[in-house]
C-alpha cells in the first residue's frame, strides 16, 4: 500500500512540475474538477491544496498530501 502512495505522489509531483497552478486557484482555493475515478489530492495541513475536486455524484480516488 505504501508503494502505491509513493507512486501516486510521484505522479502528482510530475504534474505539478509540468503545469503551473494559476494564482487565483491558490488565492481563493478554487480547483478544477477531476474526472470520475481520477486521483485527487485532499488538503492536509497548510502545505498543498486540492489538485482537483470531485464532481457531485462521483467518487474520486483520493489520497492525502502531508
UniProtKB/Swiss-Prot annotation:
Q: Which InterPro entries match?
A: CART, CART_C_sf
Could you state a single Gene Ontology molecular function term? neuropeptide hormone activity
Q: Where in the cell is it found?
A: Secreted
Q: Name one GO biological process term.
A: positive regulation of MAPK cascade
Task: State a single Pfam family of this protein.
Answer: CART
Which residue windows are transmembrane per the record? none
Which cysteines form disulfides? 34-52, 40-60
Q: In the UniProt record, which is one GO cellular component term?
A: synapse
Q: Does the keyword DNA repair apply?
A: no
Superkingdom of origin: Eukaryota
What exactly does this protein do?
Satiety factor closely associated with the actions of leptin and neuropeptide y; this anorectic peptide inhibits both normal and starvation-induced feeding and completely blocks the feeding response induced by neuropeptide Y and regulated by leptin in the hypothalamus.
Family under the similarity heading? Belongs to the CART family.
Name of protein: Cocaine- and amphetamine-regulated transcript protein
- Species for this entry: Sus scrofa (Pig)
Q: Lineage of the native species? A: Eukaryota, Metazoa, Chordata, Craniata, Vertebrata
Its encoding gene is what? Answer: CARTPT
Amino acid at each position: 500500500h505504501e508503494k502505491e502512495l509513493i507512486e501516486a505522489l510521484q505522479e502528482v509531483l510530475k504534474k505539478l512540475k509540468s503545469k503551473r497552478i494559476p494564482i487565483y486557484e491558490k488565492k481563493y482555493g478554487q480547483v478544477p474538477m477531476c474526472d470520475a475515478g481520477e486521483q485527487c489530492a485532499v488538503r492536509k495541513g497548510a502545505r498543498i491544496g486540492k489538485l482537483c475536486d470531485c464532481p457531485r455524484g462521483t467518487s474520486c480516488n483520493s489520497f492525502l498530501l502531508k
